[in-house]
Amino acid sequence: MAPGGTINITDRVVMDNYNKKSKGSLNMLYVSEYEGTPASLLLAKLKSYDIESNKERQISNESVKEINRRNTIMRDNSLDIATMVAYTEAGKSITIKEKKNVVIARTKDNGLEVGDIILSADNTTCEDVNDIKKIINNKEENDTVTFKILRNNKEKEVNSKIYLESNSKVVGVVIVTEYDYDIDPKIDIKFKNSESGASGGLMLTLTIYNAITDEDIIKDRKIAGTGTISYDGTVGEIDGIKYKIMGAAKDNVKIVFVPTANYEEAIMTKNKYKYDLEIVRVDNFKEAIEYLKK
């Protein structure tokens, strides 16, 4: 893991009659990752960069393909959440058109894979993750749940065994609910295949809000930030904050939003390298909006 840079999300918006309103921009921050060659490992040691193996990112015995797939799903889920939060805050029309429950991680070899879409559990259609939990909780340890899934556009059934973990009945998967919305105005944000993960949630929410309202919250400033976003607007902790601050400084960002949980390390990085930028800690989306409206 090494210093990264910024991604101008303002330029990624796809929307009819889109008005940027400003010469400034809203940017996500990223960290750089390099394959572990002798040269890159030597550079990491000289620069005191963090070195991690794929095993440190694995849940159970996942493949690299599953890790990458999970990060892509998390990115798309983050956009789902950002859209709901931004439209709700802006008072714009948004209704849920379709839901799907997607496996993003597995802790056991239970027949399910990252990316599987859960169509039903024991012949019962499940609206969300809570419905799946209810079916599991109504069974006993060592019972099985029959999942009908969609994998690679093909339907199939898998049987997953129930076991106890911290006194809770589980089948060893993490599932998120993805949404397809009816929204007005319609908007989308385009990503590159290499861009993944949930840490851009706050900045996606700000970008969508700026696009669908008449307000100009950017005001010709180059603004960056990081942090996950939850449906209640909470901004969550991320990894690699020092490298994101280094990347922001390299790209001449003047305002950086960070989650409160990452604030202390962000300030330490700023002070260590004497960066000329303002670090703003936020607990939720509204705090970021209020700061930009000052």
Per-segment meaning from a language model:
Residues 134-175, 273-287, 291-294:
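PDZ-domain C-terminal substructure recognizer with occasional recognition of PDZ-binding tails
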Residues 120-148, 263-266, 270-271:
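PDZ domains, with a preference for the canonical peptide-binding region formed by the helix
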Residues 152-207:
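C-terminal, low-ordered peptide segments at domain boundaries
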Residues 77, 81-129, 234-239, 260:
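PDZ/PDZ-like domain segments forming the peptide/carboxylate-binding groove
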Residues 33, 65-77, 104-105, 120-123, ...:
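Second-shell loop/turn segments in exported
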